[in-house]
Amino acid sequence: MIQSNIDFTNQLIKGKIAEIVFEQMIHQTKGYTILEFGYEKVVRQLANERKSNVANETIEIVRRAPDFAIVNEKTHDITLVEVKYMHQITPKYVKQVAQNIKKSWKQASLFIVSPEGFFFGAVSELVDNGGHIKPFHHNHIPKNRQREYLALINKYIKSE
């Protein structure tokens, strides 16, 4: 069944809200820099270029790019993170999303926003464990701050 434009737009809005909440939560965390990294920033330009097979393969890799790069300012480690909104989290769907990301970005992680909370895992681990994702835990992002951001999610995204 083809998704209507309204349904597609609705899902796009939910995804953007999830990205904004994630970005703000990390931005507020001392010791980390968050950078927009997703394909939305460059694919439109690339799509206008002449397309060879190599170019198409490259565009596909860029299309799968995670949404953010997070830099730990102390260790200089970089974590690539794809953010998804899921009303209902199922291991089968999480694994499918992780597999798609892993095709081009093996070291990326997945952050899921849902009405019940936030979830996080490395895509390679999610593929290996059948898509079972754990609740998000970060030593520098207290539970009360997560609850505040979750309340925003639930304010703007009504239950389906």
Report residues per predicted region.
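Active-site metal-binding core of divalent-cation-utilizing nuclease and nuclease-like domains
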Residues: 37-75
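Short, flexible/disordered intra-domain loops and linkers
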Residues: 4-11, 52-55, 91
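Nuclease catalytic cores
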Residues: 1-23, 27
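Short secondary-structure junctions
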Residues: 27-34
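Acidic active-site catalytic centers that drive phospho-/nucleotidyl reactions
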Residues: 19, 67, 82
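Charged phosphate-binding loop/patch that engages nucleotide di/tri-phosphates or the phosphate backbone
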Residues: 142-160
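Catalytic cores of nucleic-acid endonucleases
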Residues: 75-136
